[in-house]
Structures are given as structure tokens and as C-alpha cells.
């Protein structure tokens, strides 16, 4: 009887909490809606111009972006090719069993997360209907499109995260087996291939969805599609990223407790916490970042589209900028693949039969090679796509220079991070020496100093690059 009352009380508290959350969301939504002018509708009210109204290199914008779909298919094929290659690499039966056990545990985690996401989506869907349907008086089809594409966004984040887990668990056991002969190159090559597979798949899926909206959805309904898609992928990424981080910490602590209680080594096969720890690491370091990367790439695209449509009034210039942005995104995909193949040919020739190698060297060269190829492609594509933007013959190189500042940031950040975290870093040596000579307290203080110092240089680099980009933007 007492148990029944406790359960009833617990259920009652849950209902009260959910009701309170709904009430808070209701009043926040109503308040924000009343505070805005009647014509507001955000991205959902945006209308796309006719992409076929402007020609580029003798081809209208719609047809040019249709060609971009082929590059997306290429990216998907590239990702699947590496996926199958990793799957078919030699692996010891025991190693495969462990990696499959980790994958099955990760799968259970993802299924649970999927159910949780659907519960969250139900709350968000109610707010979407309330805001757009009741307060903004959108037509039922328009609200339905927002809801449908929010599910598409969730499915995108969730699907990429699942693909990432599958690829990584393939790569884990194959890398371990490839390391047995003692050659370092396979230990570098297999994880890098797994990362390229996930990255190419992520970008290709994202581009495919956004190009589908641009090319096949009527302009009046593109806004609801984009805002729904952005809401969905943001929701999926937030849940998978945060929950994955929490899960990995809990699993790691659990594995350590098992190690202490039973006095066994952390990676001992007799410690079942090791599997939980490995699952947690995959959840925190694969599921979360994969979904987060998908969301970041997509939301950035939606923001760029919104900025162009709101900041530019001339439909012809809108079309030029929209086509240019997406052609640039497609070319970045091609540049990444090209740089990867060139870098791998160099790395294999240099380290293929080596007994020792610095793993940071080919990774650093890949980052810089990708950045250089991307910057060159940025200027070339900009020159041919937007040579004359609104009567200005100089805008193409100014916009290309602004994008190149962002590309350069992607190369500089790893260099600055490496200066404070590399095995050959002077700061790492200082932290080790401090901990060795002065104990834990001095080691912690030394680490804090190095961390703050690194944040200073990273921040300074970002401010410098943003200032340079701002100077280009002010040139007219």
C-alpha cells in the first residue's frame, strides 16, 4: 500500500513538473509574440526568389545548383566506400566481438535517446503550433511543413550520429588489430579514414537536404522548411551532445569504481565497466560531436540564407548571393576530398613502411593543405560566379577574402592548440615538471596557467581575423 502511495505521489510530482513547464513555455511564447510587431514571423515568413532568373556561366542558378546534387551524391558515395572498406578490413575475432558489444551497447543508448527526443519534440511541436498557428495565424499547411521538417532535422542529426557510432566501432577494432605488427602508419590511416567518412557523409546529407528545399520546394514555403529543419537539428544535437557528455562521465566513474572495489586494472577484460566506459566514450566523443557538427553546418546555412534575404532587397542580387554561397559549400566538399587524397599519397609514400612516425605531422599537413586548396578555390569560384555583383566589379574578391579569413581560422586554431597540448610542447613539459617536482597542487596551477595562456592566444587570433574580415567588409 505504501509503495503504491509513493508511486502515485511520484507520478503526481512528474505531472506537476510537466504542467509547470508547459505553463512557463506558454507564457514565454505569448509574451514574446505580443512584444513583436504583427507582421513578424521570423525565418518562416521568408520567401525565396526565383533562382532561374539569373544566369551563371551561361547556366541559370537553378540548373547550376542541380549539378551540385551530383557532388552531394559523390560525397555520400565517398563516405559509404570508406565505410565498406573499414568493415572489410582484417580483424581478430575477439577484437571484433568486443567492438560489436560496444556497438550494441551504443545502439541501446541511441534507441533510448531516440525515445527521449520524440518526447522533447512533442513539447516543441506544441509550442510551434501555438506560436505559428494560433499567435501568428499561419495557415495549417505552413505549420504542418514546419513540424515535418523539424522531424527531418532531428532525423538528420540522429542518423549522422548513428552512422558515426557504426564507423567508429568498426575502426576501433581494425586499428587495434592493424597495430599488432608494430607499424605506425595503419594506426594513423584507419582512424583518419573513419573521420573522413563521417565528415563527408555529414556534409553531403546536410547539403542534399538544403539543396532539395532550395530547388524543389516553392519559394513561398521554403521559409517554413528552413526554420523547421533548423529547429529539429538543433533539438537533436542539443539532446545528443549534452546527454552524451553526461553518459560518458557516468560510465567513466562507474568503470573506475569497479576497478577500485575489485582491485583490477582499468582495461582488464574482467572489468565489465570497461565496456560501459568505451560506450560512454563513443557516446560523448562520437554521437555528440557528429550530431553537433550536422546542426552547426545546417543552422549556419539557414542563418546565411536569412541574412541574404533580409539584408538585400534586389531579388537578382539575392539569387547571385544564394547561388554563390551554395556553390562555395559544394566546392569546399570537393576541396576537402582532393586535399585528403593528396595528403594521403604523400603520407603513405613517407610513412608507409616507417617504424616510427609523428602522428601530428600528416594531420597538420592535411589541415593546411585543405585550407590552402579551399582558399584558392574560393577566389576562383567567386571570380566566375559573382564577377559583377550589383554593378560592383570588386565585390567578388572582397567576399572571397572574408570567407578566407574563416578558412584560415580553421588552420590556425589547431596550430595554437597544438602549441599547448602537443607531446613536443614546451608548456606540456612545464606542467609535467611542475607536477613531478611540486606535487598535484603545483601541477594544477601550471595547467591553469597554460590553459589561460592558450585561451589568450586563441582569442587574439580570432579578434585579429575578424578585424581583417571587417576591414574587407567596409571597403564598399
Where are these regions (language model features)?
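Hydrophobic packing and interface segments
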Residues: 3, 10-26, 30-476
Amino acid at each position: 500500500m505504501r509503495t503504491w502511495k509513493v508511486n502515485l505521489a511520484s507520478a503526481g510530482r512528474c505531472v506537476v513538473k510537466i504542467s509547470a513547464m508547459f505553463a512557463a513555455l506558454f507564457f514565454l511564447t505569448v509574451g514574446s509574440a505580443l512584444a513583436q510587431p504583427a507582421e513578424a514571423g521570423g525565418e518562416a515568413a521568408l520567401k525565396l526568389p526565383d533562382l532561374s532568373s539569373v544566369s551563371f556561366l551561361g547556366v541559370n542558378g537553378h540548373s547550376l545548383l542541380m549539378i551540385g546534387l551530383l557532388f552531394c551524391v559523390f560525397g555520400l558515395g565517398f563516405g559509404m566506400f570508406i565505410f565498406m572498406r573499414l568493415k572489410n578490413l582484417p580483424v581478430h575475432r575477439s577484437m571484433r566481438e568486443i567492438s560489436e558489444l560496444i556497438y550494441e551497447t551504443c545502439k541501446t543508448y541511441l534507441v533510448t535517446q531516440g525515445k527521449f527526443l520524440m518526447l522533447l519534440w512533442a513539447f516543441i511541436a506544441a509550442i510551434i503550433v501555438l506560436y505559428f498557428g494560433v499567435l501568428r495565424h499561419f495557415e495549417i499547411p505552413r505549420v504542418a511543413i514546419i513540424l515535418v521538417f523539424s522531424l527531418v532535422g532531428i532525423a538528420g542529426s540522429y542518423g549522422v550520429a548513428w552512422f558515426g557510432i557504426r564507423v567508429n566501432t568498426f575502426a576501433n577494432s581494425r586499428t587495434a588489430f592493424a597495430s599488432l605488427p608494430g607499424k605506425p602508419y595503419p594506426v594513423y590511416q584507419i582512424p583518419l579514414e573513419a573521420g573522413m567518412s563521417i565528415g563527408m557523409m555529414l556534409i553531403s546529407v546536410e547539403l542534399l537536404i538544403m539543396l532539395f528545399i532550395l530547388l524543389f520546394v516553392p519559394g513561398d514555403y521554403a521559409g517554413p522548411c528552413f526554420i523547421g529543419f533548423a529547429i529539429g537539428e538543433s533539438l537533436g544535437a542539443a539532446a545528443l551532445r549534452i546527454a552524451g557528455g553526461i553518459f560518458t562521465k557516468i560510465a567513466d566513474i562507474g568503470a573506475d569504481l569497479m576497478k577500485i572495489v575489485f582491485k583490477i586494472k582499468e582495461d582488464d577484460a574482467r572489468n565489465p565497466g570497461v565496456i560501459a566506459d568505451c560506450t560512454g566514450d563513443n557516446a560523448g566523443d562520437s554521437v555528440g560531436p557528429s550530431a553537433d557538427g550536422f546542426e552547426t553546418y545546417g543552422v549556419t546555412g539557414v542563418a546565411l540564407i536569412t541574412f541574404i534575404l533580409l539584408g538585400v532587397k534586389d531579388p537578382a542580387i539575392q539569387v547571385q548571393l544564394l547561388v554563390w554561397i551554395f556553390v562555395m559549400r559544394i566546392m569546399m566538399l570537393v576541396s576537402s576530398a582532393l586535399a585528403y587524397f593528396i595528403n594521403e599519397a604523400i603520407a603513405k609514400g613517407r610513412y608507409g613502411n616507417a617504424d616510427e612516425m609523428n602522428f601530428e605531422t600528416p594531420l597538420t599537413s592535411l589541415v593546411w593543405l585543405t585550407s590552402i586548396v579551399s582558399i584558392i578555390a574560393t577566389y576562383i569560384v567567386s571570380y566566375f560566379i559573382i564577377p559583377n555583383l550589383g554593378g560592383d566589379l570588386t565585390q567578388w574578391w572582397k567576399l572571397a577574402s572574408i570567407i578566407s579569413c574563416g578558412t584560415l581560422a580553421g588552420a590556425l586554431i589547431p596550430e595554437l592548440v597544438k602549441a599547448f597540448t602537443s607531446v613536443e610542447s614546451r608548456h606540456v613539459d612545464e606542467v609535467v615538471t611542475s607536477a613531478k617536482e611540486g606535487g598535484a597542487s603545483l601541477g594544477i596551477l601550471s595547467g591553469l596557467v597554460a590553459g589561460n595562456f592558450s585561451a589568450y592566444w586563441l582569442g587574439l587570433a580570432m579578434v585579429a581575423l575578424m578585424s581583417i574580415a571587417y576591414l574587407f567588409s567596409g571597403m564598399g
